[in-house]
Design a protein with these regions (language model features):
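Catalytic alpha/beta core domains of metabolic enzymes, predominantly
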Residues: 208-344
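Alpha/beta enzyme core
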Residues: 3-6, 31, 47-65, 82-88, ...
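Mixed-charge, glycine-accented linear interaction segment located at domain edges/termini
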Residues: 518-521, 525-545
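Positively charged, aromatic-enriched nucleic acid-contacting surfaces
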Residues: 452-456, 498-521
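Short beta-alpha connecting loops at secondary-structure transitions
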Residues: 204-206, 262-270, 282-294, 363-370, ...
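A mid-to-C-terminal "edge-of-domain" accessory segment
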Residues: 1-37, 288-466, 502-505
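Short, small-residue-enriched loops and turns at beta-alpha junctions
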Residues: 38, 42-43, 72-76, 130-132, ...
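N-terminal capping/small domains of soluble enzymes
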Residues: 1-104, 364, 369-376, 382
Length: 545
Protein backbone atom coordinates (compact mmCIF):
# COMPACT_ATOMS: atom_id res chain seq x y z
CA UNK A 1 0.00 0.00 0.00
CA UNK A 2 1.36 3.39 -1.03
CA UNK A 3 0.94 5.34 2.20
CA UNK A 4 3.04 8.18 0.75
CA UNK A 5 0.10 9.03 -1.47
CA UNK A 6 -1.64 10.57 1.55
CA UNK A 7 -1.07 13.37 4.02
CA UNK A 8 -3.11 14.83 6.85
CA UNK A 9 -6.02 17.01 5.76
CA UNK A 10 -6.37 18.98 8.98
CA UNK A 11 -4.28 21.94 10.09
CA UNK A 12 -2.36 22.03 13.34
CA UNK A 13 -4.05 23.96 16.11
CA UNK A 14 -1.92 26.91 17.26
CA UNK A 15 -0.50 26.59 20.78
CA UNK A 16 -3.07 27.50 23.43
CA UNK A 17 -3.97 26.66 27.03
CA UNK A 18 -6.12 23.58 26.54
CA UNK A 19 -8.17 22.45 29.54
CA UNK A 20 -10.36 19.66 28.18
CA UNK A 21 -8.08 16.68 29.04
CA UNK A 22 -8.71 17.20 32.75
CA UNK A 23 -12.49 17.43 32.48
CA UNK A 24 -15.38 14.98 32.61
CA UNK A 25 -18.89 15.12 31.18
CA UNK A 26 -21.27 16.01 34.02
CA UNK A 27 -24.52 16.93 32.26
CA UNK A 28 -26.35 16.41 28.99
CA UNK A 29 -25.95 18.95 26.18
CA UNK A 30 -28.67 20.40 24.02
CA UNK A 31 -29.52 17.69 21.50
CA UNK A 32 -30.54 18.25 17.90
CA UNK A 33 -31.69 15.33 15.78
CA UNK A 34 -30.75 15.60 12.12
CA UNK A 35 -32.36 12.27 11.16
CA UNK A 36 -34.94 13.93 8.92
CA UNK A 37 -32.34 15.80 6.85
CA UNK A 38 -28.77 14.51 7.16
CA UNK A 39 -30.05 11.03 7.82
CA UNK A 40 -32.83 11.02 5.24
CA UNK A 41 -30.69 12.31 2.37
CA UNK A 42 -28.32 9.36 2.87
CA UNK A 43 -31.01 6.68 2.44
CA UNK A 44 -31.34 4.47 -0.63
CA UNK A 45 -35.04 5.24 -0.50
CA UNK A 46 -35.75 8.56 1.25
CA UNK A 47 -38.76 8.65 3.54
CA UNK A 48 -42.21 9.54 2.27
CA UNK A 49 -44.15 12.42 3.81
CA UNK A 50 -46.12 9.97 5.96
CA UNK A 51 -42.94 8.26 7.15
CA UNK A 52 -41.31 11.60 7.96
CA UNK A 53 -44.31 12.66 10.02
CA UNK A 54 -44.23 9.38 11.94
CA UNK A 55 -40.47 9.71 12.49
CA UNK A 56 -40.92 13.31 13.67
CA UNK A 57 -43.49 12.14 16.23
CA UNK A 58 -41.04 9.46 17.39
CA UNK A 59 -38.29 12.06 17.87
CA UNK A 60 -40.68 14.23 19.88
CA UNK A 61 -41.62 11.22 22.02
CA UNK A 62 -37.94 10.48 22.67
CA UNK A 63 -37.60 14.02 23.97
CA UNK A 64 -35.70 15.95 21.31
CA UNK A 65 -36.32 19.68 21.73
CA UNK A 66 -34.53 20.64 18.51
CA UNK A 67 -35.23 18.70 15.31
CA UNK A 68 -33.82 19.50 11.90
CA UNK A 69 -36.69 18.84 9.51
CA UNK A 70 -35.05 19.58 6.17
CA UNK A 71 -33.81 21.95 3.52
CA UNK A 72 -37.13 23.47 2.36
CA UNK A 73 -35.66 25.17 -0.71
CA UNK A 74 -33.87 22.03 -1.89
CA UNK A 75 -36.97 20.09 -2.90
CA UNK A 76 -40.74 20.38 -2.93
CA UNK A 77 -40.96 17.30 -0.69
CA UNK A 78 -38.94 18.96 2.07
CA UNK A 79 -40.87 22.20 1.68
CA UNK A 80 -44.21 20.41 1.94
CA UNK A 81 -43.08 18.42 4.95
CA UNK A 82 -42.15 21.61 6.80
CA UNK A 83 -45.49 23.15 5.89
CA UNK A 84 -47.38 20.01 6.92
CA UNK A 85 -45.86 20.05 10.40
CA UNK A 86 -46.73 23.72 10.88
CA UNK A 87 -50.20 23.71 9.32
CA UNK A 88 -51.29 20.61 11.21
CA UNK A 89 -49.98 21.93 14.51
CA UNK A 90 -47.70 18.93 15.02
CA UNK A 91 -44.85 20.87 16.61
CA UNK A 92 -45.16 21.02 20.41
CA UNK A 93 -44.62 24.40 22.01
CA UNK A 94 -41.37 23.26 23.62
CA UNK A 95 -39.93 21.82 20.38
CA UNK A 96 -38.04 23.93 17.85
CA UNK A 97 -37.68 22.82 14.25
CA UNK A 98 -34.50 23.60 12.35
CA UNK A 99 -34.12 24.20 8.61
CA UNK A 100 -31.02 24.42 6.42
CA UNK A 101 -30.21 27.10 3.92
CA UNK A 102 -27.34 28.20 1.72
CA UNK A 103 -26.26 31.79 1.25
CA UNK A 104 -28.46 32.60 -1.76
CA UNK A 105 -31.28 35.10 -1.84
CA UNK A 106 -33.97 32.93 -3.45
CA UNK A 107 -33.08 29.96 -1.23
CA UNK A 108 -33.25 32.01 1.95
CA UNK A 109 -36.51 33.63 0.88
CA UNK A 110 -38.19 30.27 0.25
CA UNK A 111 -36.78 28.92 3.51
CA UNK A 112 -38.40 31.72 5.47
CA UNK A 113 -41.66 31.24 3.55
CA UNK A 114 -41.64 27.58 4.57
CA UNK A 115 -41.58 28.68 8.22
CA UNK A 116 -44.64 30.93 7.97
CA UNK A 117 -46.83 30.25 11.00
CA UNK A 118 -44.13 28.52 13.07
CA UNK A 119 -43.98 29.70 16.67
CA UNK A 120 -40.21 29.52 16.57
CA UNK A 121 -37.52 27.88 14.48
CA UNK A 122 -33.78 27.75 13.89
CA UNK A 123 -32.53 28.92 10.49
CA UNK A 124 -29.26 27.13 9.85
CA UNK A 125 -26.92 28.91 7.42
CA UNK A 126 -23.83 27.14 6.17
CA UNK A 127 -21.05 27.48 3.63
CA UNK A 128 -17.88 25.49 3.13
CA UNK A 129 -14.65 26.94 4.49
CA UNK A 130 -11.90 24.33 4.08
CA UNK A 131 -8.79 25.16 2.10
CA UNK A 132 -9.43 22.24 -0.24
CA UNK A 133 -13.01 23.25 -1.04
CA UNK A 134 -12.07 26.91 -1.42
CA UNK A 135 -9.46 25.94 -3.99
CA UNK A 136 -10.95 23.07 -5.99
CA UNK A 137 -14.72 23.47 -5.59
CA UNK A 138 -15.53 27.17 -5.21
CA UNK A 139 -12.37 28.83 -6.55
CA UNK A 140 -12.77 31.59 -3.98
CA UNK A 141 -10.41 33.42 -1.65
CA UNK A 142 -10.79 33.64 2.09
CA UNK A 143 -12.25 37.10 1.76
CA UNK A 144 -14.84 35.93 -0.75
CA UNK A 145 -15.88 33.01 1.46
CA UNK A 146 -16.31 35.37 4.42
CA UNK A 147 -18.37 37.74 2.30
CA UNK A 148 -20.59 34.85 1.20
CA UNK A 149 -21.36 34.06 4.85
CA UNK A 150 -21.95 37.70 5.78
CA UNK A 151 -24.24 38.19 2.79
CA UNK A 152 -26.21 35.15 3.93
CA UNK A 153 -26.70 36.66 7.36
CA UNK A 154 -27.93 39.92 5.84
CA UNK A 155 -30.39 38.14 3.57
CA UNK A 156 -31.75 36.15 6.50
CA UNK A 157 -32.19 39.36 8.48
CA UNK A 158 -34.01 40.88 5.51
CA UNK A 159 -36.63 38.13 5.32
CA UNK A 160 -36.84 36.67 8.84
CA UNK A 161 -38.15 38.14 12.08
CA UNK A 162 -37.49 37.90 15.80
CA UNK A 163 -39.35 34.60 16.19
CA UNK A 164 -36.38 32.76 14.80
CA UNK A 165 -33.04 31.71 16.18
CA UNK A 166 -29.97 31.33 14.01
CA UNK A 167 -27.18 28.86 13.47
CA UNK A 168 -24.05 29.12 11.39
CA UNK A 169 -21.83 26.24 10.29
CA UNK A 170 -18.43 26.63 8.65
CA UNK A 171 -18.92 23.42 6.70
CA UNK A 172 -15.79 21.24 6.55
CA UNK A 173 -14.61 22.99 9.72
CA UNK A 174 -12.35 20.06 10.61
CA UNK A 175 -10.31 20.72 7.44
CA UNK A 176 -10.21 24.49 7.90
CA UNK A 177 -7.27 26.53 9.18
CA UNK A 178 -8.04 27.63 12.75
CA UNK A 179 -7.28 31.29 12.18
CA UNK A 180 -9.68 31.37 9.24
CA UNK A 181 -12.38 29.45 11.12
CA UNK A 182 -12.17 32.01 13.93
CA UNK A 183 -12.21 34.90 11.44
CA UNK A 184 -15.29 33.77 9.53
CA UNK A 185 -17.25 32.77 12.63
CA UNK A 186 -16.52 36.10 14.30
CA UNK A 187 -17.61 37.92 11.14
CA UNK A 188 -20.93 36.07 11.31
CA UNK A 189 -21.22 36.79 15.04
CA UNK A 190 -20.69 40.50 14.45
CA UNK A 191 -23.35 40.52 11.76
CA UNK A 192 -25.97 38.59 13.75
CA UNK A 193 -25.08 40.53 16.93
CA UNK A 194 -26.37 37.89 19.36
CA UNK A 195 -27.03 38.61 23.04
CA UNK A 196 -27.07 36.41 26.15
CA UNK A 197 -30.87 36.43 25.83
CA UNK A 198 -30.89 35.59 22.11
CA UNK A 199 -27.89 33.44 21.44
CA UNK A 200 -26.39 32.39 18.13
CA UNK A 201 -25.44 28.76 17.51
CA UNK A 202 -21.98 28.30 16.03
CA UNK A 203 -21.85 24.73 14.78
CA UNK A 204 -18.43 23.15 14.18
CA UNK A 205 -18.85 20.07 11.97
CA UNK A 206 -16.47 17.31 11.06
CA UNK A 207 -18.16 17.22 7.67
CA UNK A 208 -15.49 14.63 6.95
CA UNK A 209 -13.70 13.06 9.90
CA UNK A 210 -9.97 13.46 9.22
CA UNK A 211 -8.26 13.26 12.61
CA UNK A 212 -8.28 11.55 15.94
CA UNK A 213 -10.88 12.86 18.42
CA UNK A 214 -8.27 14.67 20.54
CA UNK A 215 -7.32 16.87 17.56
CA UNK A 216 -10.97 17.76 17.05
CA UNK A 217 -11.32 18.53 20.77
CA UNK A 218 -8.36 20.91 20.46
CA UNK A 219 -10.04 22.58 17.48
CA UNK A 220 -13.31 23.00 19.39
CA UNK A 221 -11.68 24.38 22.53
CA UNK A 222 -9.50 26.74 20.51
CA UNK A 223 -12.62 28.09 18.80
CA UNK A 224 -14.49 28.32 22.09
CA UNK A 225 -11.69 30.44 23.54
CA UNK A 226 -11.42 32.73 20.50
CA UNK A 227 -15.04 33.41 19.56
CA UNK A 228 -16.33 36.93 20.16
CA UNK A 229 -19.34 37.42 22.45
CA UNK A 230 -18.79 33.95 23.89
CA UNK A 231 -21.57 34.44 26.45
CA UNK A 232 -23.95 34.99 23.55
CA UNK A 233 -22.88 31.94 21.56
CA UNK A 234 -23.84 28.27 21.82
CA UNK A 235 -21.00 26.09 20.53
CA UNK A 236 -22.47 23.10 18.74
CA UNK A 237 -20.82 20.06 17.14
CA UNK A 238 -21.87 17.83 14.28
CA UNK A 239 -19.52 14.90 13.84
CA UNK A 240 -19.29 12.26 11.15
CA UNK A 241 -17.91 8.77 11.45
CA UNK A 242 -15.47 8.39 8.55
CA UNK A 243 -12.72 7.14 10.89
CA UNK A 244 -15.09 5.32 13.23
CA UNK A 245 -14.82 7.81 16.08
CA UNK A 246 -17.82 10.08 15.59
CA UNK A 247 -19.17 9.36 19.06
CA UNK A 248 -15.78 9.88 20.72
CA UNK A 249 -15.28 13.14 18.83
CA UNK A 250 -18.60 14.50 20.09
CA UNK A 251 -17.86 13.39 23.64
CA UNK A 252 -14.41 14.99 23.72
CA UNK A 253 -15.90 18.11 22.14
CA UNK A 254 -18.25 18.38 25.12
CA UNK A 255 -15.20 18.41 27.37
CA UNK A 256 -13.73 21.11 25.13
CA UNK A 257 -16.62 23.53 25.57
CA UNK A 258 -19.35 22.34 23.19
CA UNK A 259 -22.85 22.87 24.57
CA UNK A 260 -24.91 21.25 21.85
CA UNK A 261 -24.69 18.04 19.81
CA UNK A 262 -26.24 17.29 16.43
CA UNK A 263 -26.52 13.68 15.34
CA UNK A 264 -28.81 10.84 14.38
CA UNK A 265 -30.33 7.76 15.93
CA UNK A 266 -27.96 4.82 15.54
CA UNK A 267 -25.57 6.90 13.42
CA UNK A 268 -27.37 7.01 10.08
CA UNK A 269 -25.91 9.55 7.66
CA UNK A 270 -23.73 10.17 4.62
CA UNK A 271 -20.95 7.64 3.91
CA UNK A 272 -20.20 6.00 7.26
CA UNK A 273 -22.78 8.04 9.12
CA UNK A 274 -23.19 10.72 11.74
CA UNK A 275 -22.50 10.56 15.45
CA UNK A 276 -24.98 8.23 17.12
CA UNK A 277 -26.94 10.32 19.61
CA UNK A 278 -28.47 7.22 21.20
CA UNK A 279 -25.00 5.89 22.03
CA UNK A 280 -23.76 9.24 23.36
CA UNK A 281 -26.88 9.59 25.52
CA UNK A 282 -26.69 6.04 26.86
CA UNK A 283 -22.98 6.42 27.55
CA UNK A 284 -23.98 9.30 29.84
CA UNK A 285 -26.81 7.26 31.34
CA UNK A 286 -24.38 4.42 32.13
CA UNK A 287 -22.35 6.68 34.44
CA UNK A 288 -25.31 8.22 36.23
CA UNK A 289 -25.94 11.31 34.08
CA UNK A 290 -29.50 12.09 33.01
CA UNK A 291 -29.31 12.22 29.19
CA UNK A 292 -32.57 14.16 28.94
CA UNK A 293 -33.79 11.70 26.29
CA UNK A 294 -36.31 8.91 26.77
CA UNK A 295 -34.63 5.76 25.52
CA UNK A 296 -36.35 3.41 27.96
CA UNK A 297 -38.20 1.66 25.14
CA UNK A 298 -35.22 1.07 22.89
CA UNK A 299 -36.84 -1.89 21.12
CA UNK A 300 -39.67 0.34 19.89
CA UNK A 301 -37.16 2.91 18.64
CA UNK A 302 -35.12 0.21 16.91
CA UNK A 303 -38.22 -1.15 15.16
CA UNK A 304 -39.23 2.34 13.99
CA UNK A 305 -35.71 3.08 12.74
CA UNK A 306 -35.66 -0.10 10.68
CA UNK A 307 -39.13 0.58 9.32
CA UNK A 308 -38.62 4.20 8.31
CA UNK A 309 -34.97 4.11 7.25
CA UNK A 310 -35.15 0.62 5.77
CA UNK A 311 -31.74 -0.03 7.27
CA UNK A 312 -30.53 -2.76 9.60
CA UNK A 313 -28.74 -2.21 12.88
CA UNK A 314 -25.49 -4.12 13.19
CA UNK A 315 -25.87 -6.96 15.71
CA UNK A 316 -22.80 -5.67 17.58
CA UNK A 317 -24.06 -2.07 17.71
CA UNK A 318 -23.66 -0.56 21.19
CA UNK A 319 -26.83 -0.91 23.27
CA UNK A 320 -29.12 -1.45 20.25
CA UNK A 321 -27.55 -4.46 18.54
CA UNK A 322 -29.24 -7.84 18.77
CA UNK A 323 -26.10 -9.23 20.41
CA UNK A 324 -25.37 -6.28 22.70
CA UNK A 325 -26.62 -8.23 25.71
CA UNK A 326 -25.24 -11.65 24.88
CA UNK A 327 -22.12 -13.49 25.91
CA UNK A 328 -20.37 -16.41 24.22
CA UNK A 329 -17.24 -16.50 26.36
CA UNK A 330 -17.47 -18.89 29.25
CA UNK A 331 -15.69 -16.54 31.66
CA UNK A 332 -17.97 -13.67 30.65
CA UNK A 333 -21.07 -15.80 31.09
CA UNK A 334 -19.89 -16.94 34.49
CA UNK A 335 -19.17 -13.38 35.64
CA UNK A 336 -22.53 -12.10 34.40
CA UNK A 337 -24.37 -14.93 36.15
CA UNK A 338 -22.53 -14.45 39.43
CA UNK A 339 -23.07 -10.69 39.36
CA UNK A 340 -26.80 -11.09 38.75
CA UNK A 341 -27.05 -13.65 41.56
CA UNK A 342 -25.12 -11.34 43.87
CA UNK A 343 -27.41 -8.41 43.11
CA UNK A 344 -30.42 -10.60 43.88
CA UNK A 345 -29.14 -11.41 47.35
CA UNK A 346 -27.27 -8.18 48.13
CA UNK A 347 -29.38 -5.15 47.33
CA UNK A 348 -27.14 -2.45 45.88
CA UNK A 349 -27.83 1.27 45.31
CA UNK A 350 -26.12 1.05 41.91
CA UNK A 351 -26.13 -1.34 38.98
CA UNK A 352 -23.01 -3.51 39.03
CA UNK A 353 -22.17 -6.09 36.41
CA UNK A 354 -18.72 -6.82 34.96
CA UNK A 355 -19.84 -7.01 31.33
CA UNK A 356 -23.18 -5.19 31.21
CA UNK A 357 -22.74 -1.46 31.78
CA UNK A 358 -26.49 -0.83 31.68
CA UNK A 359 -29.29 -2.99 33.05
CA UNK A 360 -31.02 -4.06 29.82
CA UNK A 361 -34.42 -3.86 31.51
CA UNK A 362 -33.93 -0.07 31.76
CA UNK A 363 -34.06 -0.05 27.95
CA UNK A 364 -36.90 -2.57 27.74
CA UNK A 365 -34.38 -5.15 26.60
CA UNK A 366 -33.48 -8.47 28.21
CA UNK A 367 -30.39 -10.33 29.35
CA UNK A 368 -31.18 -13.30 27.20
CA UNK A 369 -29.99 -14.92 25.23
CA UNK A 370 -26.70 -15.87 26.74
CA UNK A 371 -25.57 -17.72 23.67
CA UNK A 372 -23.92 -21.09 23.98
CA UNK A 373 -21.23 -22.26 21.60
CA UNK A 374 -17.99 -24.20 21.89
CA UNK A 375 -16.36 -21.27 23.74
CA UNK A 376 -19.04 -21.11 26.42
CA UNK A 377 -18.58 -22.26 29.99
CA UNK A 378 -20.65 -23.49 32.87
CA UNK A 379 -21.76 -19.97 33.81
CA UNK A 380 -23.71 -19.56 30.60
CA UNK A 381 -25.18 -23.05 30.84
CA UNK A 382 -26.20 -22.39 34.42
CA UNK A 383 -27.94 -19.17 33.41
CA UNK A 384 -29.87 -20.76 30.54
CA UNK A 385 -30.93 -23.85 32.47
CA UNK A 386 -31.99 -21.83 35.50
CA UNK A 387 -33.77 -18.91 33.83
CA UNK A 388 -35.37 -20.88 31.02
CA UNK A 389 -36.13 -24.20 32.68
CA UNK A 390 -35.88 -23.65 36.43
CA UNK A 391 -32.98 -26.07 36.92
CA UNK A 392 -30.40 -25.12 39.55
CA UNK A 393 -27.71 -27.50 38.34
CA UNK A 394 -24.78 -28.28 40.69
CA UNK A 395 -21.41 -26.85 39.66
CA UNK A 396 -19.72 -30.23 39.31
CA UNK A 397 -22.47 -31.45 37.00
CA UNK A 398 -22.27 -28.21 35.00
CA UNK A 399 -18.55 -28.78 34.56
CA UNK A 400 -19.19 -32.21 33.09
CA UNK A 401 -22.13 -31.02 31.00
CA UNK A 402 -20.17 -28.10 29.53
CA UNK A 403 -17.67 -30.56 28.04
CA UNK A 404 -20.56 -32.33 26.30
CA UNK A 405 -21.93 -29.03 25.02
CA UNK A 406 -18.54 -28.06 23.57
CA UNK A 407 -18.43 -31.31 21.61
CA UNK A 408 -21.96 -30.86 20.26
CA UNK A 409 -21.46 -27.18 19.41
CA UNK A 410 -18.14 -27.87 17.69
CA UNK A 411 -19.84 -30.50 15.57
CA UNK A 412 -22.69 -28.21 14.58
CA UNK A 413 -20.48 -25.11 14.10
CA UNK A 414 -23.27 -22.94 15.41
CA UNK A 415 -24.90 -21.46 18.48
CA UNK A 416 -27.16 -23.77 20.51
CA UNK A 417 -30.65 -22.53 21.32
CA UNK A 418 -31.92 -22.91 24.92
CA UNK A 419 -34.29 -25.72 23.90
CA UNK A 420 -31.40 -27.59 22.28
CA UNK A 421 -29.35 -27.22 25.44
CA UNK A 422 -32.17 -28.62 27.54
CA UNK A 423 -32.71 -31.50 25.12
CA UNK A 424 -29.03 -32.44 25.40
CA UNK A 425 -29.16 -32.17 29.19
CA UNK A 426 -32.24 -34.37 29.28
CA UNK A 427 -30.68 -36.91 26.91
CA UNK A 428 -27.58 -37.37 29.06
CA UNK A 429 -28.95 -37.00 32.58
CA UNK A 430 -32.73 -36.82 33.12
CA UNK A 431 -34.95 -39.85 33.88
CA UNK A 432 -32.70 -42.15 31.86
CA UNK A 433 -34.04 -45.59 30.93
CA UNK A 434 -31.35 -47.22 28.79
CA UNK A 435 -29.93 -49.60 31.41
CA UNK A 436 -31.87 -48.92 34.60
CA UNK A 437 -35.57 -48.11 34.22
CA UNK A 438 -38.13 -47.77 36.99
CA UNK A 439 -41.34 -49.72 36.38
CA UNK A 440 -42.97 -49.12 39.78
CA UNK A 441 -42.03 -49.07 43.42
CA UNK A 442 -43.49 -49.01 46.90
CA UNK A 443 -41.90 -48.20 50.21
CA UNK A 444 -43.05 -47.99 53.77
CA UNK A 445 -41.49 -46.61 56.92
CA UNK A 446 -41.16 -48.63 60.09
CA UNK A 447 -39.64 -46.38 62.71
CA UNK A 448 -36.37 -45.05 61.34
CA UNK A 449 -36.11 -47.78 58.74
CA UNK A 450 -37.60 -47.87 55.24
CA UNK A 451 -38.58 -50.97 53.30
CA UNK A 452 -38.63 -50.71 49.52
CA UNK A 453 -40.08 -53.00 46.87
CA UNK A 454 -39.36 -51.98 43.28
CA UNK A 455 -39.77 -53.37 39.80
CA UNK A 456 -36.74 -52.20 37.82
CA UNK A 457 -35.58 -53.06 34.31
CA UNK A 458 -31.84 -53.67 34.41
CA UNK A 459 -30.29 -53.99 30.94
CA UNK A 460 -33.75 -54.83 29.54
CA UNK A 461 -34.73 -57.47 32.12
CA UNK A 462 -37.33 -56.71 34.79
CA UNK A 463 -36.15 -57.43 38.32
CA UNK A 464 -38.12 -57.42 41.54
CA UNK A 465 -35.94 -55.70 44.14
CA UNK A 466 -36.51 -55.60 47.87
CA UNK A 467 -34.30 -54.06 50.52
CA UNK A 468 -34.22 -51.99 53.67
CA UNK A 469 -32.37 -48.82 54.52
CA UNK A 470 -32.57 -45.55 56.41
CA UNK A 471 -34.64 -44.04 53.59
CA UNK A 472 -35.89 -44.82 50.07
CA UNK A 473 -32.54 -44.01 48.43
CA UNK A 474 -30.52 -46.01 50.92
CA UNK A 475 -32.90 -48.95 50.51
CA UNK A 476 -32.76 -48.76 46.70
CA UNK A 477 -28.96 -48.50 46.80
CA UNK A 478 -28.76 -51.64 48.92
CA UNK A 479 -31.11 -53.45 46.53
CA UNK A 480 -29.10 -52.46 43.44
CA UNK A 481 -25.82 -53.54 45.03
CA UNK A 482 -27.29 -56.88 46.03
CA UNK A 483 -28.86 -57.53 42.63
CA UNK A 484 -25.91 -56.52 40.42
CA UNK A 485 -22.85 -56.88 42.61
CA UNK A 486 -21.85 -53.32 41.69
CA UNK A 487 -20.38 -51.35 44.58
CA UNK A 488 -21.06 -47.60 44.68
CA UNK A 489 -21.66 -44.73 47.07
CA UNK A 490 -23.92 -41.70 46.80
CA UNK A 491 -21.55 -38.74 47.03
CA UNK A 492 -23.89 -35.89 46.12
CA UNK A 493 -27.58 -35.25 46.62
CA UNK A 494 -29.64 -32.12 46.10
CA UNK A 495 -33.22 -31.38 45.18
CA UNK A 496 -35.44 -28.37 44.58
CA UNK A 497 -38.87 -27.48 43.27
CA UNK A 498 -39.01 -26.40 39.64
CA UNK A 499 -41.86 -24.03 40.46
CA UNK A 500 -43.14 -22.38 43.60
CA UNK A 501 -46.49 -24.17 43.97
CA UNK A 502 -47.30 -27.44 45.72
CA UNK A 503 -48.28 -29.00 42.38
CA UNK A 504 -44.91 -28.27 40.81
CA UNK A 505 -42.34 -30.84 39.83
CA UNK A 506 -39.24 -31.61 41.82
CA UNK A 507 -35.74 -31.94 40.42
CA UNK A 508 -33.20 -34.18 42.14
CA UNK A 509 -29.48 -34.35 41.35
CA UNK A 510 -27.47 -37.40 42.43
CA UNK A 511 -23.84 -38.35 41.89
CA UNK A 512 -22.43 -41.79 42.69
CA UNK A 513 -18.84 -43.04 42.83
CA UNK A 514 -17.71 -46.56 41.98
CA UNK A 515 -14.78 -48.31 43.67
CA UNK A 516 -12.31 -46.72 41.21
CA UNK A 517 -13.54 -43.21 42.10
CA UNK A 518 -15.39 -42.64 38.82
CA UNK A 519 -18.36 -40.30 39.21
CA UNK A 520 -21.72 -40.77 37.51
CA UNK A 521 -24.48 -38.16 37.50
CA UNK A 522 -28.22 -38.63 37.24
CA UNK A 523 -31.16 -36.24 37.41
CA UNK A 524 -34.74 -37.10 38.25
CA UNK A 525 -37.72 -34.86 37.50
CA UNK A 526 -41.17 -35.84 38.79
CA UNK A 527 -44.13 -34.32 40.66
CA UNK A 528 -43.31 -36.60 43.63
CA UNK A 529 -40.04 -35.79 45.42
CA UNK A 530 -39.42 -39.43 46.40
CA UNK A 531 -39.95 -40.58 42.83
CA UNK A 532 -37.65 -37.87 41.45
CA UNK A 533 -34.95 -39.14 43.84
CA UNK A 534 -35.43 -42.75 42.72
CA UNK A 535 -35.29 -41.70 39.05
CA UNK A 536 -32.11 -39.68 39.66
CA UNK A 537 -30.38 -42.62 41.34
CA UNK A 538 -31.38 -45.04 38.57
CA UNK A 539 -30.21 -42.53 35.91
CA UNK A 540 -26.79 -42.40 37.56
CA UNK A 541 -26.61 -46.14 38.28
CA UNK A 542 -27.44 -47.05 34.67
CA UNK A 543 -24.17 -45.41 33.60
CA UNK A 544 -22.30 -47.75 35.94
CA UNK A 545 -23.66 -50.89 34.27
Amino acid sequence: MNYQKYHKLYFDVPPFARTWPGKQITSAPRWCSVDLRDGNQALFSPMTLEEKVAFFKLLVKIGFKEIEVGFPAASETEYQFTRYLIENDLIPEDVTIQVLTQSRDHIIKKTVEALEGAHHAIIHLYNSTSALQREVVFHKSREEIIQLAVDGVRMIQKYADDRFSYEYSPESFSCTEMDFAVEICNAVIREFAPTPEKKLIINLPTSVEVSTPNIYADQVEYMSQHLDRRDSVIVSVHTHNDRGTGVASSELALLAGAQRVEGTLFGNGERTGNADIAVIALNMFSVGIDPQLNLDNLEEIIDAYKKFNKLPIHPRHPYAGAMAYTAFSGSHQDAIKKAMDYCETHKQPYWQNPYLTIDPTDLNRVYEPILINSQSGKGGLSYVLETKFGLTVPKALLQEFSATIKIVSDGKHTVLEPEEIYDIFEKYYVNLKDKAELVDYHFKLAGEEAHLDANVKLCGKTRMLSAQGNGPLDALSNALRAETGKAFEIVFYNEHALEGSSSSKAATYIAINDTQGNMYWGVGIHPNINTSSVLALLSAFGKLL
